[in-house]
């Protein structure tokens, strides 16, 4: 029932604190950061997520223009990089997200009406792996999160993956 429209979904990660250790001689380094991550999963516009006790259920709606499931987290990425970070480098690592908020938002055709549901039963800890190809201050990355987004038995089995562009 959770029909995610992948190419309309958006993820934004902002690392507020960042630290790096790098060996010029061995061309290897380690990066760690702390920041915020915002995931906005676009779902079918004729569905709204609602809680039935602790269970997340889809409900059919009419007149929906856009329906989203949003997760806001404290984001802690860690990567080991090989190569020259000022030119070309490759990094692999992982991340840990501590979920602060989750909600469902529906925007209807008549623009002014919105419906919100906060506090969906998501797992507090979410973790994943990252691979990144960096060209100076620009990078192409992919992430996969094998941990479930919803608590066991409270929603659909759902992992996320992301392909994106990074700056700095």
Predicted features and spans:
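Detector for outer-membrane/organellar transmembrane beta-barrel domains
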Residues: 62-101
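Surface-exposed strand-loop-strand hairpins of Gram-negative outer-membrane beta-barrel proteins
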Residues: 1-15, 150-152
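Short loop/turn motifs that connect adjacent beta-strands in outer-membrane beta-barrel proteins
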Residues: 21-29, 84-87
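Transmembrane beta-strands of outer-membrane beta-barrel proteins
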Residues: 28-34, 74-76, 88-94, 129-131, ...
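Extracellular/periplasm-exposed beta-strand and loop segments of Gram-negative cell-envelope proteins
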Residues: 1-7, 41-71, 99-110, 114-130
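Early exported N-terminus immediately downstream of N-terminal targeting peptides
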Residues: 25-49
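Transmembrane beta-strands of outer-membrane beta-barrel pores
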Residues: 20, 34-42, 96-102, 137-139, ...
